[in-house]
Amino acid sequence: MPIVNAYGITECSPGVAVNRLDSLTYNTVGYPIPCVEIRIDNPDESGNGEICVKGDNVMLGYYNDPQRTAEVLHDGWFRTGDYGNLNDKGQLSITGRKKNIIVLKNGKNIYPEEIEDYIMIIPYVNEVVVYATRDEDGNQNGLCAEAFVDQKKVEEMGITDVAKQFKADVFEALKELPVY
């Protein structure tokens, strides 16, 4: 049975986009389903912005919560809180969550999920989380990646200093990442 990536959220009953077997593209969740329109609001220089969805499948509002409804529904467009972009074929890629964005001192947006995807390429990493670090005054002063490793793979690969190897592998994996 073929398996493909798709994207959906509860407020959109739940389908929004799905890959098709005849046009799979790496790192996308595919094309909008037939009754759905997708637009990217306020895209940055790389095309990433908030994913907005319009269609018959979009909810009418949150039950007994008109304030929350007004925050996310505008002229029939639902603001998902997810960030992504559309490629030149119209396929959707998800890059992160609005509430997870880390804003650097230079004003650039960092999507921790994007960095995590690159780190997950490392064969002995099972899970990773990237987050902003803060100084004693609460000001952001850097990024940190914490990983959970597969100890069996570490042993099979003959790695004796996991921290040292992880640091080297992260720097290698992130060479493909855009410069922020």
Regions found by a protein language model. Name each.
Residues M1-L92, K98-I101, N126:
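Conserved AMP-binding/adenylate-forming
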Residues G55, L60-G61, Y83-Y180:
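AMP-binding/adenylate-forming catalytic core of the ANL superfamily
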